[in-house]
Amino acid sequence: MESLVSVCAQKLVCDHSSLRRALDLMPKELYPALFKAAFLGKKTLVLQDLVQTWPFAVLSFHKLLNSNRHCDPQLATEKPSKLCVQTVILGVITYLSDALTKGPEGPQAGRQRLRLLDMTGMQEEGLEQNPDTMSLWSRTVTLAKACIDVSKRHSEEVMQVSKRRRSCHINALPASSPLYIEVRVDLFVNSTSYGVLREALLVSSHSPLRLQCRDFRAEELSLRSTAGLLELLNPGSVRQIDLRFNNLGLSGLNVLLPHMAKFSHLQSLKLPYSNVDVRRLSPVMEEGLQSFASQLGQLGALKELNLGSSRLSGRLRQLLGGLQRPLESLELAFCSLLPMDLSYLSQSSHMSSLRKLDLSGNNLSEFLLTPFLHLLAEISGHLLYLDVMECKLADAHLSALMPILCRCSWLRYLGLFCNPISSDGLRMVLQNLVRLPELHLVVYPFPVDCYSDPTHFSSTAASLDSSFDHEKLTRVGEELQQMLVRAQRMDMVWTTDMYVQRTLDSLSL
């Protein structure tokens, strides 16, 4: 049920002219509720007025939009409106321009000055882009251009003021503390946006609008460009670095890791699709692997590591043994792991802290099954997220897997997509998993008996679209939903959408 504050805020933002006249008399405690109502209601004129008169030092999207205190929490799950995000950015720029031009007599006189715009933690797009929402890449480009524009205009204004003073023979005034707004943001860059982001980061340190990166993601970017951007990031603000599809190889990773050592708060390092294969190393490459492991060990705050799609057969002990602290999240999808790798994990210090584990794409049906079950038993008391997509797990393995999986009492997410499990197998899995009180999302595979030709089951997700008996598949889905109703677990989502968990921030688990 919505609160009275929420209902009143929604009514107020519908009357822009009246609200604008009343803003000077409005208690500052109402601003968060008004902002949320205006943002979710797409009241852009109201949003701009609220931002330009914001009475607090911090304006945080995540805290304002995800608070359940003032508005319907169901609305907060919607993806942010592109127009509303642009409006807030424009409002901050206008606010800053007025403050720089008018100084202490400007519109913020008597109010606490806005110092931080926090745009981190916003809902991200799924697989399909919605033209009415704003992707992380688009937000990055928009903010970069805004930073450059504000910096240029400020420099021009400073030069004009200086010229006027010289022409009037007025001595320079004592330097005052610079007025600026810090923008805490997650950045996503590729070769298309590299130039504008680099320019923005270069001017950011002395611009009135200063970018502070929390999570940095780069795709399909050259080694030199990636290293250059890492050098421009604030060492104290970076929490996550995600480099993917960059074809870096061991040599490239060893060039970049020294640039990361300065990030004292770096908790997450994601290096999927880095073209690393340790199965046949030359002596020089062996030295490179040892250097890579040694430099990983220098990242003292690291608690999340993704080495997906690198062939790491038999080398987990070497790579993870030197880390300064146990990992809480480990993603090893399609890493060609051996039994000795999983046995090492079961005995390592990481075993006591792992909350997220992704072993997708490793064949758990044969030699890896026993060490996998042993590892799962060891981490069952604190595991929150398990992804075993495309691991060749079939009905024959469920009798061994289910008893251990049911011990994972804190499990929130389970990924079983693209495993050759039958409809009967899925029913058995559901009957067991409804006992787990924290489990709210299961991504299950298309049952093998729903294929037009079950003998030609494919483990490749891209080939699954056209080979089903769609009527049978629909019936199975409906039956699973009915089972959830009978078990009184309507809070649990069972889906075949493998992208549904894309927006999950594992650092917030």
From Swiss-Prot:
Keyword Endoplasmic reticulum included in the entry's annotation: no
Q: Which SUPFAM superfamilies match?
A: RNI-like (SSF52047)
Q: At which residues are the LRR repeats?
A: 111-146, 210-234, 235-262, 263-298, 299-323, 324-355, 356-374, 380-407, 408-432
Q: Where in the cell is it found?
A: Cytoplasm
Q: Which GO terms describe its cellular component?
A: cytoplasm
Name residues in a coiled coil: none
- Which InterPro entries is this protein grouped with? Leu-rich_rpt, LRR_dom_sf, PRAME_domain
> Which keywords belong to this entry?
Cytoplasm, Leucine-rich repeat, Repeat
Q: Which family does it belong to?
A: Belongs to the PRAME family. LRRC14 subfamily.
For this entry, the protein name equals: Leucine-rich repeat-containing protein 14
Q: Which gene encodes it?
A: lrrc14
